[in-house]
């Protein structure tokens, strides 16, 4: 089972709101997920992002792969830098 960290679309039509979730790569975009690790609202200025950093780092260390968009969100929040430092400075 390949696990991905990706965005799950919520909100109404033309008013998107996303949950950052950990899900099986075979499940549909808005389908079943394993854990919710944050939220992302692109409509606010600036876009509001709330992430559970410890849980995200735990999932990344266990092999979860972030989607491209989620990887960009994590990079802006500094999570990818912490992950790479922890992974390669052992």
From Swiss-Prot:
Pfam families: Ribosomal_S16. GO terms for cellular component: cytoplasm; small ribosomal subunit. The keyword Cell membrane does not apply. Keywords: Ribonucleoprotein, Ribosomal protein. One of its GO terms (molecular function) is structural constituent of ribosome. GO terms for biological process: translation. InterPro entries: Ribosomal_bS16, Ribosomal_bS16_dom_sf. Signal peptide: none annotated. The keyword Ribonucleoprotein applies. HAMAP family: Ribosomal_bS16. Belongs to the bacterial ribosomal protein bS16 family. This is Small ribosomal subunit protein bS16. It comes from Pediococcus pentosaceus (strain ATCC 25745 / CCUG 21536 / LMG 10740 / 183-1w).
